[in-house]
Amino acid sequence: MKNYSKNATHLITVLLFSFVVILLIIPSKCEAVSNDMQPLEARSADLIPEPRYIIDVPPRCPPGSKFIKNRCRVIVP
């Protein structure tokens, strides 16, 4: 008879522990789902830092050419 009560105590302990774990996991899963359901603009606004000033630097041209009107042009001597 003692063996049955020990098994029952162990079973109840395992069930209580799993119940507590489930209670801890479910709210975090729901929060993740609610974050996924937000519009893309709302989520990306949190991730993107403030815009930095972009300096328009012309591309480098090979030797013997210059950057003229958005293209590298070969200068004929």
Curated annotation (Swiss-Prot):
Stretches assigned to coiled coil: none
Cystine pairs: 61-72
Signal peptide (residue range): 1-32
Keyword annotations from UniProtKB, A to Z: Disulfide bond, Secreted, Signal
Tissue expression summary: Expressed by the venom gland.
Cellular localisation: Secreted
Residues that make up the propeptide removed upon maturation: 33-52
GO cellular component, one term: extracellular region
Superkingdom as given in the UniProt entry: Eukaryota
A Pfam cross-reference name: Secapin
Task performed by this protein: Nontoxic peptide.
Family the UniProt entry places it in: Belongs to the secapin family.
Name this protein carries in UniProt: Secapin
Origin species: Vespa velutina nigrithorax
